[in-house]
Amino acid sequence: DSSLKQVSVRYDVAELIIWNCNTNCKVIVQCKGFIGMTDLCIWDDQIILQAECRNMPWSDVIRSQDAFLQSLCKAYPYSSQWDERRLEDGVVVLSVLLTNHIRFRLYCQRIDVATCGEHANSN
C-alpha cells in the first residue's frame, strides 16, 4: 500500500511525494515539462489503489479521446511547440486512482522517480 503525502507544482515541474508502507520508503515522482493535471481530489483519502504511466507519441495525442489532451490540441492547433518544449516529442500521462475512486492524471514530457535516497530515474 502507498499513500499520497504531498502534491506540489512549481511552474513546469509537478512533484508527488508518496509513502510506500511495504518498504517504509518515501518515493518522489517528478513530472518535468509539466503540462497540466486533472481531477485531483484528496479531501478525504490519499491511499493509492493503482498508478500507471503511459508514454504517448504525438500521433496518439492528436487522436486521443482524453478530454484534457483534446483541449491541448485545440489550444495549439497550428503548432505543437512553445518555448523549448515540443509536443511532437509526445506526452507522458501518469494516472493515479485513489481509494475514493477518483482518478487524477498528470501530463508532462518526462517522469523521474527516486526512492529512499536514490537518484531520480527517468521514464
Q: Which ranges hold each PLM region?
A:
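Surface-exposed, interaction-prone regions used to assemble/regulate multi-protein complexes
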Residues: 1-123
